[in-house]
């Protein structure tokens, strides 16, 4: 069981941006941030999210940088679907980079806390048909 924080047309950097108490959530259940949800978690923990040089919408090639249970059975490179105007530029110190694309430095990450991962984030949309291995990633989150 876990909670998925989805995408949003909003920016995490605007006043009154949608927010959630992630610190509370991760004490009780694993959290999986997708797009806006990933940007929000990175920002809350001290990362940096900036406006993208250009809005990214469409297919991208995801490259696994570090093996992890979230990316179990995922090819070293796979097609993913991007739809975002902001980009995670810098991860918080306790976060680990799991994957990138050609155009963004942070496409997948996790936060380690006492050896347990209770927080994952993806800049891309695994739930979209064009993310060819997205269903596997979601399954990995829900079953591990």
PLM segments and residue spans:
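A conserved active-site-flanking secondary-structure segment within enzyme catalytic domains
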Residues: 22, 26, 39-79, 85, ...
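Short, surface-exposed beta-strand/loop micro-motifs that present aromatic residues
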Residues: 104-116
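Acyltransferase
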Residues: 115-118, 123-144
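Flexible gly/pro-rich beta->alpha loop and the following alpha-helix that scaffold active-site loops
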Residues: 1-34, 39, 45, 139-144
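Active-site glycine-centered loops adjacent to acidic/histidine catalytic or metal-binding residues
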Residues: 35, 84, 125
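N-terminal leader/targeting and accessory segments in enzymes
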Residues: 80, 86-88, 96-98, 112
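Proline-centered loop/turn at the N-terminus of a beta-strand
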Residues: 30-32, 96, 118
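Active-site-proximal beta-strand elements of phosphoester/diester hydrolases
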Residues: 81-82, 98, 119-124
């Amino acid at each position: 069981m876990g909670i998925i924080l989805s995408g949003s047309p909003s920016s995490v950097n605007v006043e009154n941006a949608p927010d959630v108490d992630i610190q509370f959530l991760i004490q009780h259940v694993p959290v999986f941030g997708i797009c806006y949800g990933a940007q929000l978690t990175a920002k809350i923990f001290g990362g940096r999210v900036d406006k993208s040089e250009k809005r990214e919408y469409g297919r991208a090639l995801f490259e696994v940088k570090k093996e992890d249970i979230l990316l179990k059975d995922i090819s070293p490179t796979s097609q993913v679907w991007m739809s975002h105007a902001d980009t995670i530029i810098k991860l918080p110190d306790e976060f680990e980079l799991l994957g990138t694309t050609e155009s963004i430095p942070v496409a997948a990450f996790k936060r380690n806390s006492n050896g347990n991962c209770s927080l994952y984030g993806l800049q891309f949309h695994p739930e979209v048909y064009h993310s060819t291995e997205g269903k596997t990633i979601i399954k990995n989150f829900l079953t591990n």
